Amino acid sequence: MLFSPRLTTCLVLFLSVLLPCAQAAPRKIIIDTDPGTDDAMAIMLALNSPELDVRAITVVPGNVIAKQGLDNALRMLSLANRCDIPLAAGAQHPLFQKLITAEFWHGKNGLANIELPPSKCKVDARWAPDLIIELLHASPHEITLVPIGPLTNIALAVEKDPSIVPLAKELILMGGSISGGNSTAVAEANIYGDPEAAQIVFQAGWPLTMVGLDVGDKTLLSRKHLAQLGKTHGPVNDFIYKVAEFLIQLGEKFGDSGTPMYDPLAVGVAIDASIVTAPLMHVDVETRGEFTRGQTVANRRNANEKNVLHHFPDGDRYIVEGLEKVEPNAKVCTEVNAEKFLELFVSRIQGK
């Protein structure tokens, strides 16, 4: 069939307008969570974002015990009318150490003491690490893991089936810091909650982005944003408003002007990676230090001194003979466009 030059020109113009508007396929993600307050904000952000396709939610102990976290996740899925998403229970405790919970920061039930209605949703019968393994094999190179709690479930999945590592598209985790901690002087809470699991995950070899305190502490949801959330209403909007209000009030007791959006920011990076700057670094997790257990130790220059042993009449010593390259294993978020993310968060919770 032949087209006239005029018709061809019209078709080209039509397609030039249409094609940029075509939406990319939503990114498939699995959220692994210890459902506390900022987890709640992260989950609702993910469920309200058309860029994301939440394939499963798995629960790990951390902010609250595993049973409470599972109940919280069930109620949130029901509130959002998303019982179609598989929800699975996982580990009941860290790999080696005793569980550390944080009701002080999250309320007695982990959800700012807000009593959500009983859930209509059901728990998936599969164990969380098994569900993660199954979904990665079913959709190779398509699913991004977004763990926003201790990394116990992810480590258990890797230990059970190392072949999942190349099957994951990416892993975007909330955790760690290269500039000091919040659980201790050097350790961030999610990594401190299970350092051995974190070391397994960091050394596994997949594309990994660390969304830590370095950017989370710069991303504060303030009373200005709370006022914006208060302009609209709905089950999810009203719930997140109350959670945010609880966290802001808690932060004000310590002189903070807002609440850090730790977990939601990891979901934000899954939506739009351009909101952060994330140079490549080699990251290890300290598992033995008396004062440094749980620290994420980042090699910013990806090199170590090369020390060579030499023998001398007066004794042996090492001499520095240049540098040895260390392969980076993570993108480490160091800068963030906080206002861009906060505008995104508020608009999505409002259903815009």
Predicted regions and their residues:
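Metal-dependent C-N hydrolase catalytic cores
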Residues: 27-29, 70-138, 320, 325-332, ...
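A residue-level signal for conserved active-site and pocket-lining positions in enzyme catalytic cores
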Residues: 87, 201, 267
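Active-site histidine-anchored catalytic micro-motif
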Residues: 25-33, 37-75, 109, 115-218, ...
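Bacterial N-terminal signal peptides
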Residues: 9-20
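Bacterial N-terminal signal peptides that target proteins for export
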Residues: 1-11
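Conformational coupling and interaction surfaces
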Residues: 25-27, 44-45, 53-54, 192, ...
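Structural signal for hydrophobic packing residues in well-ordered secondary-structure cores
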Residues: 77-81, 136, 140, 205, ...
